[in-house]
C-alpha cells in the first residue's frame, strides 16, 4: 500500500503547475492559485459536488498523462483499485486521495479549522480495509455521498466542500499550531515559604479534577493578551531560528513554550486580524476640505480581538471569507445588534466574540507631525472589507466589496464599491479615479478653492492646491 503515495505523485502532481506554498495558501485562504493551474481547485466549488467543467478539463489532462505512463504504473493501479481501464470515477477517486495527501502535508505544519490531523500512513492503512463493495460503487458512480462516506471512514468526520475557510477568525487558524491544548503547566516563581508552597500544590491538586482545563494557563493567557493589547511595543523572548512555531522544531530542541507561542500568536493576530486596510495615496488632489468635516465623520468601531468592523450598518460586504455579521442577541426593539451595551456595567461588548477591547479608527484622516523640527502633514485613506482576515484579499482573482470615503472633496460620506480586486483597490486614490456617493452626484458644494473671497484656506485645500498630482 506504500505505492499509493508514489502513484499519486506520478499521475496527479503534474497537474499542479504552480509555485511553492500554493497548497498551504489554498487551505489557509481558500483560493490562492490561478484557475486551471492546480487540480485541487476541483474542490473549490459552491455546488453540492465537484464543478463539472473543471473536472472535465483536468480529466482530459490526466488522461494524456495516463497514456504516457509506464506499465509499472498501470500494474500498481490495477493492484490497488482492481481496474485496468482508466475511468472518470477512478480519476475522481485519485484526485480525492491526492487532496487528502496534500491536506496531511499541510496539517503537519499547522492546525486548520475543523480539519482533523491524521498521518498519511494511517490514511493508507484505513483505506486498505475499506470495504471493496463500497469502493466499487464509488468507482462506478462517484457522487458526494460516496466520497463523503469514504471521508467519514478515513477521518471520522464529514467532507467539507469547499475547503473550510469560513470561521469567525480566519487569521487565527494560522496560529492554532500543532497539538495546541490548554493543559500546559505554568512555572511559578515564589519564595521558599511554607504557606506559599501550599498554595501552588493545592492549585495543582485541584486543577487535575477541573473539567475546564488548566485555569492557571488560561489566566496567564489573559494577562499576555491584555498586555499585548495595551502596550505599543514589547519583546517576546523567542529562541534564535525558532521564530516560526508553525515549522516543526528539531528533535534536539525542546518544545516551544506554549505561553510564548500564544504571545507570538496574539502579536501577529493584532497585526493581521483586521477589517480596515490602509490605501496608498497616489494623488493628493482628492484631499478633502476641512470646512465640511464633522467630529463623528469616518469613525469605524473595530473589535481589537476579532478584528471586525461593528458599525458598518446594513451594508452587506461580499467576500470569499465573509459571513453574516448579524448578532444573535436581541434587544427590546427586536433588532439585531453588532454592539452590546450593558446597562449594569456601563460597558460595550462586541456581539461577535464578546470582547470589551473596542477601538475607534478613522478611514480618512489628516494629521500633523513634527519630525526633526519640521512640520509634516499626512493624509490617510482606508477601506473597510467584509472579512477580518486581510490576507484573504491578496489574491488577484478574489473579488470583494469595500466601503471607502467619497472621492468628492466637500463630502464626508462613504461609498460602497462592488467587485473590487486588490489591484484596483491599490490604485483607488489616484488622479483618474472617481467614486462619489449618490448625494454628491446631484449636488455641488464649494470648497475653499472655489470661493473667490476666501481668506483663510483650510489645511486640506492647501494640500490639494500645493501638492503636484502624479
Curated annotation (Swiss-Prot):
GO cellular component, one term: membrane
Residue ranges crossing the lipid bilayer per the database entry: 80-102
Membrane topology of this protein: Single-pass membrane protein
Superkingdom of this protein's organism: Viruses
Subcellular localization(s) per the UniProt record: Host membrane
Coiled coil stretches, renumbered: none
Keywords noted in UniProt: Host membrane, Membrane, Transmembrane, Transmembrane helix
GO biological process, alphabetically ordered: viral process
Keyword Protease included in the entry's annotation: no
Name listed for the protein in its UniProt record: Protein U33
Gene it is expressed from: U33
Amino acid at each position: 500500500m506504500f505505492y499509493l503515495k508514489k502513484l499519486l505523485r506520478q499521475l496527479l502532481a503534474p497537474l499542479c503547475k504552480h509555485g511553492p506554498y500554493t497548497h498551504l495558501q489554498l487551505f489557509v485562504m481558500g483560493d490562492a492559485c490561478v484557475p486551471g493551474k492546480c487540480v485541487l481547485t476541483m474542490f473549490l466549488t459552491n455546488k453540492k459536488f465537484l464543478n463539472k467543467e473543471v473536472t472535465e478539463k483536468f480529466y482530459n489532462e490526466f488522461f494524456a498523462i495516463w497514456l504516457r505512463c509506464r506499465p509499472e504504473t498501470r500494474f500498481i493501479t490495477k493492484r490497488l483499485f482492481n481496474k485496468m481501464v482508466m475511468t472518470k470515477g477512478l480519476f475522481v477517486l485519485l484526485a480525492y486521495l491526492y487532496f487528502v495527501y496534500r491536506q496531511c502535508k499541510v496539517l503537519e505544519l499547522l492546525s486548520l479549522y475543523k480539519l482533523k490531523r491524521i498521518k498519511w500512513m494511517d490514511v493508507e492503512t484505513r483505506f486498505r480495509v475499506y470495504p471493496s463493495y463500497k469502493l466499487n460503487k464509488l468507482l462506478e458512480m462517484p457522487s458526494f455521498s460516496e466520497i463523503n462516506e469514504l471521508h467519514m471512514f478515513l477521518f471520522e468526520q464529514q467532507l467539507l466542500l469547499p475547503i473550510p475557510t469560513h470561521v469567525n477568525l480566519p487569521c487565527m487558524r494560522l496560529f492554532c499550531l500543532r497539538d495546541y491544548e490548554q493543559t500546559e503547566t505554568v512555572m511559578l516563581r515564589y519564595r521558599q515559604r511554607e504557606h506559599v508552597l501550599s498554595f501552588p500544590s493545592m492549585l495543582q491538586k485541584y486543577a487535575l479534577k477541573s473539567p475546564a482545563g488548566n485555569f492557571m494557563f488560561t489566566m496567564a493567557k489573559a494577562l499576555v493578551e491584555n498586555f499585548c493589547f495595551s502596550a505599543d511595543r514589547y519583546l517576546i523572548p523567542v529562541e534564535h531560528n525558532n521564530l516560526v512555531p508553525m515549522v516543526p522544531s528539531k528533535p534536539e530542541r525542546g518544545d516551544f513554550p506554549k505561553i510564548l507561542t500564544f504571545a507570538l500568536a496574539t502579536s501577529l493576530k493584532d497585526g493581521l486580524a483586521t477589517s480596515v486596510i490602509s490605501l496608498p495615496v497616489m494623488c493628493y488632489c482628492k484631499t478633502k476640505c476641512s470646512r465640511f468635516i464633522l467630529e463623528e465623520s469616518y469613525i469605524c468601531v473595530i473589535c481589537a480581538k476579532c478584528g471586525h468592523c461593528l458599525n458598518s450598518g446594513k451594508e452587506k460586504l461580499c467576500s470569499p471569507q465573509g459571513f453574516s455579521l448579524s448578532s444573535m442577541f436581541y434587544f427590546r426593539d427586536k433588532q439585531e445588534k453588532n454592539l452590546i451595551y450593558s446597562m449594569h456595567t456601563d460597558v460595550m461588548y462586541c456581539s461577535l466574540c464578546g470582547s470589551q477591547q473596542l477601538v475607534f479608527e478613522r478611514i480618512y484622516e489628516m494629521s500633523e507631525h513634527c519630525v526633526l523640527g519640521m512640520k509634516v502633514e499626512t493624509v490617510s485613506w482606508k477601506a473597510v472589507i467584509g472579512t477580518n482576515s486581510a490576507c484573504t484579499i491578496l489574491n488577484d482573482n478574489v473579488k470583494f466589496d469595500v466601503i471607502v470615503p467619497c472621492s468628492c472633496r466637500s463630502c464626508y460620506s462613504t461609498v460602497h464599491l462592488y467587485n473590487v480586486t486588490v489591484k484596483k483597490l491599490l490604485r483607488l486614490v489616484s488622479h483618474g479615479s472617481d467614486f462619489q456617493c449618490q448625494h454628491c452626484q446631484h449636488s455641488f458644494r464649494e470648497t475653499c478653492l472655489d470661493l473667490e473671497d476666501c481668506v483663510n484656506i483650510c489645511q486640506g485645500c492647501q494640500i490639494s492646491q500645493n501638492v503636484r498630482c502624479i
